[in-house]
UniProtKB/Swiss-Prot annotation:
Lineage start: Bacteria, Bacillati, Bacillota, Negativicutes, Veillonellales
Role: Low-potential electron donor to a number of redox enzymes.
Protein's organism: Megasphaera elsdenii
Pfam family, one: Flavodoxin_1
The entry's keywords: Electron transport, Flavoprotein, FMN, Transport
Protein's UniProt name: Flavodoxin
Amino acid sequence: MVEIVYWSGTGNTEAMANEIEAAVKAAGADVESVRFEDTNVDDVASKDVILLGCPAMGSEELEDSVVEPFFTDLAPKLKGKKVGLFGSYGWGSGEWMDAWKQRTEDTGATVIGTAIVNEMPDNAPECKELGEAAAKA
């Protein structure tokens, strides 16, 4: 089972989650997609393959009222998990994703892939690739 957990402010990261979910299903794996606000750390940590989505906020950082505290609580439970990261951005160069990937690797998790898209994804190959990687993980 692949668990997709995301936060979206404008709909772009949600669109990415939908594209990734479709790719996981097309690759033959079971998948569940949920917003950070609608799940809890223990449920997410119980999954073997976890895809986390958050757009770049502020000065290239994670959304700070929901995603950052959730990830901080989840981090100690990620050791040995297969984790993918995704998100959209409107400015900057994707530094938030590089930092998030490093933080995730520092937990002992294996990062199976990342996907970043400028603005709205439209059949973004990055989303398909991440979904396929998650299905095979």
